[in-house]
């Protein structure tokens, strides 16, 4: 994988979302090693960003200490942007996040992104364990975003409460969401917006429209900048890709059933694992999941870009075999995807 061709800068930017999956029969340490290997591969292929999610108390996901993992990935790469997709701000004090990301930005200048979400990223009991009180939560999200952003300002050095490491640092802040709430807030604040269409497809188009229509230019952006997150399982043949995708189906099936399991190996027939209602629920969640060979994917993903008009796509690939996962991103990077042409 050392001589992979770089993706052309003429094409639409592609980025990676990594949940750091723990594989059945493997360890958490294996998951961390695989993530660093994937990040290095993505960098060599010309991907723009490598973001890590925040999830807690989930048997198949190791991305809980997001800031720590960002440092691990940034330290093992040299050019790719590394960030959070995202930090679930209700779980944290804004000051602590400012200190963490200010530290990261000093260690890895002009390479750190800060994506912020308002969901807990876990169940209610675990959310309570994280916060320890009910005084702060999703209702405080707009105020907490603004407080966090203030810590990055140079003039905050005159404040009685400071995040010294963060002051004056260039840390792009993104708002992440799966509904119109974050879209509207991102528009009002003039921030870039990423939509979680990889698991919550229903409000993708309405949220993008709201974001663009309500966008107010800021010192950060003159015009809206949107990103959609999708699932991609690419392989050399359509048949192989659909086989590999059964690990993704099993992962989402376990989520809706409340079953705590690591990522499972692919299977020959999913009908042995789900009933009709479960299949419908999973496939609805995975509406924006693209599976197939390079030829199949180019057509389908380009159509998605034409429909959504997003400026960038971020890709999650829930693939059990690590080498197959690397190959999936290699195939994706080879596609000549371009910014969408409006459908008339």
Residue ranges and their predicted role:
Residues 14, 42, 46, 54, ...:
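Conserved, mostly hydrophobic/aromatic
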């Amino acid at each position: 994988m050392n001589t992979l061709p770089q993706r052309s800068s003429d094409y639409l930017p592609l980025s990676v979302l990594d949940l750091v999956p723990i594989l059945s029969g493997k360890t958490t340490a294996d998951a961390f090693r695989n993530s660093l290997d994937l990040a290095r591969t993505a960098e060599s292929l010309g991907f723009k960003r490598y973001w890590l999610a925040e999830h807690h108390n989930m048997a198949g996901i190791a991305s809980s200490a997001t800031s720590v993992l960002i440092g691990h990935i940034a330290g093992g790469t040299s050019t790719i942007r590394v960030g959070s997709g995202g930090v679930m701000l209700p779980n944290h004090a804004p000051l602590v996040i400012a200190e963490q990301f200010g530290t990261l930005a000093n260690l890895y200048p002009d390479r750190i992104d800060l994506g912020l979400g308002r969901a807990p990223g876990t169940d209610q009991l675990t959310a309570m364990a994280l916060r320890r009180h009910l005084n702060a939560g999703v209702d405080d999200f707009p105020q907490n975003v603004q407080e966090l952003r203030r810590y990055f300002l140079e003039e905050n050095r005159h404040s009685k409460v400071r995040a010294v490491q963060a002051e004056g640092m260039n840390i792009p802040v993104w708002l992440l969401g799966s509904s119109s709430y974050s879209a509207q807030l991102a528009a009002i604040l003039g921030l870039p917006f990423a939509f979680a269409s990889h698991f919550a497809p229903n409000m993708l188009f309405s949220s993008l429209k709201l974001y663009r229509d309500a966008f107010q230019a800021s010192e950060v952006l003159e015009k809206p900048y949107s990103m959609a997150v999708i699932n991609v399982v690419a392989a050399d043949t359509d048949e192989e890709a659909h086989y590999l995708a059964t690990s993704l189906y099993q992962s989402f099936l376990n989520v809706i059933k409340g079953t705590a399991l690591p990522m499972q190996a692919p299977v020959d027939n999913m009908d042995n694992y789900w009933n009709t209602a479960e299949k419908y629920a999973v496939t609805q969640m995975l509406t924006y999941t693209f599976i197939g060979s390079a030829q199949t994917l180019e057509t389908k993903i380009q159509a998605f870009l034409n429909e959504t008009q997003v400026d960038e796509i971020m890709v999650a690939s829930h693939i059990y075999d690590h080498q197959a996962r690397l190959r999936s991103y290699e195939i994706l990077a080879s596609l000549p995807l371009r910014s969408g042409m409006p459908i008339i």
